Amino acid sequence: MQNILVYQTQTYQTLVPANKRKMEYGLEHVYTRLNRIRRNRGYSFEHVLVQKLNGRVWSARRLGGSSANLPDIIAVNNKESIFLSIEAKSGTADSLYVPSDQIQRCFQIRDMFQIYKTAHVILAFKFMQKRRIREEGKTVYAHRKLQEFYKIADRYSKMKDLPVIKCTYDGSTYEIRNSQARKCFLKDYLMPFSVNSIL
């Protein structure tokens, strides 16, 4: 079997022109690099959030997010009996999205900690200072003000069919179901640190 796979690979390399193979490898390399940048951007936001939350009253930890099928962050205030299950998104576009399955897992973890008097699912959005736009088929970046929003998603706790949540640069939120977007109002959560500040 292994010999057959090696033979097929060698045949492909012989039949496909070198410049096409180079182009395919180049595109794969670009996509890999873009995905890595997006992951690093997300990890950076999560890391900064944890740093800002950790203090005399609050304790926070990153859990691993999508790869671990867990929320990005959990934070607790044991003095005031508050628990937060946080899904964090950051990017350079004008809109950021939280998939329904990621919201669901936040509720699953939140519901495990019913000993806390107050428990919220928080959708955290960070719009980077660089705004990505397309001009004449090219991607360019323009400077803009850093924006952060922390939305309470508790209203979806009892729903079986959760929507995708979209947040725009001005803080407006939308529910997306079956490719249809409908504006919704999610209350802002007052975080225990200065919002839109760079740590």
Language-model region placement:
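Conserved catalytic cores of phosphodiester-cleaving nucleases, focusing on short active-site segments
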Residues: 53, 73-75, 82-92
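Active-site metal-binding core of divalent-cation-utilizing nuclease and nuclease-like domains
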Residues: 55-79
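Short, charged, amphipathic alpha-helix that recurs within catalytic cores of restriction-modification
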Residues: 96-123
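Short, solvent-exposed loop/turn segments that connect beta-strands within catalytic domains
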Residues: 78-82, 115-118, 131-137
